Amino acid sequence: AKAYHSDEEDTVRVVTRHKAYVTIDNRRLPVNQDITVPAGDHAIRIVILAQEGFPCIYINSKYLVTDGTWVCDHLAGGPVPVGTWDAYTSPEDDPTVFPFAYETIHPVKVVNTDEGKLYDFGREMFSVVRFDADPAATVRVVYGESKEEATEPAEALIRETVTGKAHYDLVPRAFRYICVKSDGAEPANVIADYEYLPLEDRASFSCNRRDVKKIWDICAYTLHLNSREFFLDGIKRDRWCWSGDAYQSYKANNYLFFDPEITKRTIVALLGKPPYEQHINTINDYSMYLIIGAYEYYYATGDKEFIQVYYPRLKALYDFIEGRTNEAGYVCQRPGDWIFIDWSDIDKGGDLCAEQILFWQCRNAMASLSELVGLDGDSYRKAAEKLKRNIMRDFWREDRGGFVDCYTTGREHITRHANICAIMYDFVTEKRARKITRMVLENDEITQITTPYFEFFELCALGKMGKLTAVQKKIESYWGGMVKLGATSIWEQYLPEQVGIQHYGMYGMKYGCSLCHAWGGGPIYLLGRYCLGVYPTSVGYETYAVEPNRGMYKHIDGKVPLPEGGEVTVKMDGHTCTVYTTRAGGTLILKGKEYAIPVGEAFTVEY
């Protein structure tokens, strides 16, 4: 529904695929027919019964169009803004058909094996396999992210057997290799149609170290592959929205695509609808990442309307989290809960410190979100302050310079995770953060991180503490380690001490490890944020900083996207730094000095 004005008589046609009728100025009229509307002020309301698909309409007249100015309801409750997306711009478009693009990929190599013909398509992708075959033949297709998986049918995660057709367009799958075996004539014209969401790469990064550019490109490709209807965790498995994984994708998105729509879609998909009966993905920390991520989305974009619409759900989720705390006021494991944090040797025998620091940040986020929609956030801030005092009392060990995992088991075990969170979210003073960095993060006796997931968080903490060289070295050794082993996308887990096909095993499955996992895209954010040095200093990048740091690189050259199509380019060597931006509000911070960055012209500082 909406109110609008027409300066003259106009013809309006409401196009829809559903049962519906339109009311204009209290006149009930049919859809999918031309309606003559006189000049003047009008009120229009459309009632739709959509038994299948999304209830949707299309109007494109002189004075009335379908856009974001409409509101809707479900005949109960108050109106909310409609959903729109510029991917659908004509009456022939169907919002139930997601706007993927396709590119035909031919195999780069074909070899005969005992299990059939092995087709190598050159790199990981998500594609529809197409081929011609003898209708009388039975054809088996085995998919593999590695050639070993594709040629071991008994252990491969995805296999498909077809018969009875002369041509096949198989269900889209994730793979680099397929092994095809027929009991009749060999299938012909085997190709793959790469299916992807056509997001534009609006960022770049290069330096004097060529391997870094390759790592950056593969990380960008990994994020591309997992950017679909929503941010997925991986394209082979689980092809699912996991909130912690998605939280990292939101961050990388802002430094590669800066596409608000996919972040919003993912947040909405994860939120679902109240009442909440379990944590998001059943994981306590993932519920909190969703609330924290919603606030960070607002801070990056300034999209207040989105928060206003979904605040009631965020509030309901927070109340669910709060309602499952224990007598000490701590997040704890209730029946059905999964205390995850990371795949690591963490003492989870009682209340877990990392969970409590996330809960503290979650309360701060709720305070800001509440104030944004005109409600009082003070109660959340006071609760956060009380929680912080308790965490410092129970978990902090001054003599060891870090937080223990759990204070009730007597093990006094220190891992990196809680200490990383403490730095990332400014939970501790700078003095204590430096102590944590020295005594925990730079301490090789503390168990190392084994997943790109929490390795990303650790590098965020190190970057925040000015340890850029350590970040750069880890990118080259950890992410670069996968690339040197032939990875064309970043893996779910990488253990450098493993060899051969050991890298592919996980969860008790020989090929269970995902070789294309979105949480591997961290260097996109890390290099854009801490090397090129671009970050917002107020909501929606109304003001922002460019604080470049070469670290161990001799020169850097890159671009970071900004909201509303803006961008900032940074070039820096040992003597000069040049910044070019298309958006006002930027400040260059270099060697302790600040410079206002002009818009639309190269700004160079010698140092």
Where do the model's predicted regions map?
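Active-site acid/base region of carbohydrate-active enzymes
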Residues: I191, P198-I218, H224-L225, F231-Q248, ...
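Short beta-alpha connecting loops at secondary-structure transitions
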Residues: Y299, I339-G349, V404-T408, M439-I446, ...
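Non-catalytic C-terminal accessory modules of carbohydrate-active enzymes
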Residues: Q472-Y607
